[in-house]
Amino acid sequence: MSAIPDRAGYALVTGGGARLGAAMVRRLAADGWAVAIHYHHSATHAEALAQEIKSGGGRAVTLDGDLGALGSFADLFGRANAGWGFCSLLVNSASAFEYDDIATVSRATLQKLFAVNLHAPVLLARDFAAQLREGSKGLIVNVLDQKVFNLNPDFLSYTLTKTALEAATRLLAQAMAPSVRVCGIAPGLTLRSGEQTAEGFAAAHASTPLGFGSQPEDIAEALVFLAKVPSITGTTIVVDGGQHLQPRTRDVMFTYGIAPDAPVGKTGK
């Protein structure tokens, strides 16, 4: 029996209004999926993206929600289910990203990042299974980071959350089979973050073993690939130009474009 997600359902992409999430939304829509675009801070981008898809003949809706504070994740599905029936593809792309290290880590930062980057994907997986139509197959894809395979202590809380989510990907794949497959995609340096300069980003992007890093479109293609290959579950595809093969004692942005002692602000990933 095929484990390809039921195309009678729709795809929900958290953090789908901007950055990597938007690239995945566009690719899914181009592949014929009806897409629910979740956002929190990117309302203007999400609404424009939905209109772009609908203008091209596709189906899209937007869903607002703070994944760090939502009392019921089932409501997120319920709002889209009212028009489309059920969700058969969940992409956990939303991510909180903030610099800290062992000297600056705090309980507040840990709680905030774990709420969005781990608690939300796991609870969304639970509610995804509950609303999946009986007899249908589903797919959950967690967006991770090549850092989980190439550890360094920068962005300490963020790295801990993504490492935990990689483990959760394998655990959920065991727990949710055979009706739901669970996979991960681990991008490398794909978009500028924080205080990194354009020149520094370009240099870092070119420093991988392949001579180039990942593009948003590469991540989106990996997602479509996972949706179409029914025998893949419990594993993570690293899409990074080989960045994870280059051990570093500090995050790559401190090698290219940011002084080691420069302050690094909050940003999206």
Q: Can you name each region flagged by the protein language model?
A:
Residues 10, 17-19:
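Conserved glycine-rich cofactor-binding loop
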Residues 93-99, 242:
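Conserved NAD(P)H cofactor-binding loop of Rossmann-fold oxidoreductase domains
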Residues 101-102, 109-114, 204:
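Substrate-binding pocket helix/loop in short-chain dehydrogenase/reductase
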Residues 139-177, 189, 243:
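Catalytic loop of short-chain dehydrogenase/reductase
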Residues 166, 176-190, 232-239:
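Conserved Rossmann-fold SDR core element
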Residues 208-219:
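A conserved structural motif in NAD(P)-dependent oxidoreductases
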Residues 217-239, 244-245:
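C-terminal substrate-recognition "lid" of short-chain dehydrogenase/reductases
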